[in-house]
Amino acid sequence: MQASATVRNALLDAIETAIGVSPTLKIFDGAMPANVGVADAGTVLATMTLPSDWMAAASAAAKAKSGTWQDAGADASGLARYYRLYAGATCHLQGLCGQNWAGSTAYSLNQHVVNGNNVYKCTTAGTSASSGGPTGTGTGITDGTCVWDYVGPKEMVLDNGNIAAGQQITVNTYQWNAGNA
């Protein structure tokens, strides 16, 4: 099925309406559960109540976060690997998260980074190259002394994916896209 931009915008806006105002966002370490109906996995690193109007109106079949998404003090230390979005106790959305890749930076085993439109997991800790970063959708991607595996498409970008308890955490970017034009 293919849909016009108007229909795709309406679909994206309906997701925000269905979840409701001021949902709770939780950032976790560990492996992402198989689906939103499965119990949380890993440690909750950060918890934040989002603004009442937490997503901007959809436009051109894309819908981006609205307002500031921030936790003034992280709940625990760990590596941000996935997020879950709740209305009350019900998880409605989950997906990958990480920080933007940076050159000549030390990365830890299992740390997630975002490069281009992809999320990568560090499988060999080390220091990234001075430029470029991981690319492609394979495994064993060499970048300086780091080795990366492709995990999935970019969803949520944090200011820092290696979180310390008490640290302020900010979601820099979050966007939904509706394909099938």
Language-model features: locations:
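Small cysteine-rich, disulfide-bonded extracellular modules of the LU/uPAR three-finger superfamily
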Residues: 1-83, 87-98, 151-181
